[in-house]
Amino acid sequence: MSNLSPDFVLPENFCANPQEAWTIPARFYTDQNAFEHEKENVFAKSWICVAHSSELANANDYVTREIIGESIVLVRGRDKVLRAFYNVCPHRGHQLLSGEGKAKNVITCPYHAWAFKLDGNLAHARNCENVANFDSDKAQLVPVRLEEYAGFVFINMDPNATSVEDQLPGLGAKVLEACPEVHDLKLAARFTTRTPANWKNIVDNYLECYHCGPAHPGFSDSVQVDRYWHTMHGNWTLQYGFAKPSEQSFKFEEGTDAAFHGFWLWPCTMLNVTPIKGMMTVIYEFPVDSETTLQNYDIYFTNEELTDEQKSLIEWYRDVFRPEDLRLVESVQKGLKSRGYRGQGRIMADSSGSGISEHGIAHFHNLLAQVFKD
């Protein structure tokens, strides 16, 4: 039996019929008890996309990521193997590294100067030779499962987890089809926000283009909503639509088969292949608590020296498109706590699965029901 409060139990068939569906109750977006359940049953057991492989391409490259209160360090060893560890010294718990950059050949704890090789093994602990029964095997860094998949880096805190492909079957091939240059991408810009919104609120917003017309005029000037589809693939979904050139957003040659591909990956990552060749954007979500989500919005191009047009596009994302979505989810988070909100919202899923249908939200909420079932 589950230890869940009855207030946080959903039937297994919740949202199974999108055309009759309502959202999960508002308390699932605001209550810390729901988030604590998600920490253990979603984020500690799922593959989470945390970076593009190009950020960790060379020996000694490292990045750190914070998710559900855990700090994780990813580092490529001198043997070229990429590994992940909990970013904590086994001696007394001090964090080892911060930010990102180039690690030295050993990672030295700033507290008592314990030193660790980049494969996680203990290199040296001061005075250990004078400590009875000191066991260096019990002084190694604790590893975190890591896989490189479809050009990106995924981690999983469950040591018994199966592969990324098992969680997201078929995704890698489809990403490569949409963006053949995915392995050649390089980080061009990152916008980091500590967003006052629940992670599911942000996913909901991504999983529908019903709001695109009213809220994203520049984007809507390029996407052809009458030639836009959203297909469900288990733990991932694909939004696909043909594009047209726009002076407000995406500029490219008329007459091409340019398109948008928007991949949502359970639980909280969004990969976007734009109509611009050799470009992707990625939204990485790192939940902090029930009403706070750290987000990295990354923009990638295949070329390192950016063109003026690429710089202008980055500015449009930074100053126009990204703030539009942030305002939406922040407002929704406030509204979910209002006495005037009836607790659940009707999911606007139509029978044809049109470009403005919200059936993607129903699919997501049905997956959530499997986490919150009794």
From Swiss-Prot:
The gene is yeaW. It comes from Escherichia coli (strain K12). [2Fe-2S] cluster binds at residues 89, 91, 109, 112. Pfam families: Rieske (PF00355), Ring_hydroxyl_A (PF00848). The keyword Oxidoreductase applies. Its EC number is 1.14.13.239. Converts carnitine to trimethylamine and malic semialdehyde. Can also use gamma-butyrobetaine, choline and betaine as substrates. Binds 1 [2Fe-2S] cluster per subunit. Binds 1 Fe cation per subunit. This is Carnitine monooxygenase oxygenase subunit. One of its GO terms (molecular function) is identical protein binding. One of its GO terms (biological process) is carnitine metabolic process. Composed of an oxygenase subunit (yeaW) and a reductase subunit (yeaX). It comes from the Bacteria. The keyword NAD applies. InterPro entries: Carnitine_monoox_A, Rieske_2Fe-2S, Rieske_2Fe-2S_sf, Ring-hydroxy_dOase_2Fe2S_BS, Ring_hydroxy_dOase_asu_C_dom, Rng_hydr_dOase-A. It is an enzyme of class 1 (oxidoreductase). Keywords: 2Fe-2S, Iron, Iron-sulfur, Metal-binding, NAD, NADP, Oxidoreductase. Fe cation binds at residues 211, 216, 325. Its cofactor is [2Fe-2S] cluster; Fe cation. Belongs to the bacterial ring-hydroxylating dioxygenase alpha subunit family. CntA subfamily. GO terms for cellular component: protein-containing complex. It catalyses: (R)-carnitine + NADH + O2 + H(+) = (3R)-3-hydroxy-4-oxobutanoate + trimethylamine + NAD(+) + H2O; (R)-carnitine + NADPH + O2 + H(+) = (3R)-3-hydroxy-4-oxobutanoate + trimethylamine + NADP(+) + H2O. Residues 47-155 form the Rieske domain. The lineage of its organism: Bacteria, Pseudomonadati, Pseudomonadota, Gammaproteobacteria, Enterobacterales. Pathway: Amine and polyamine metabolism; carnitine metabolism.
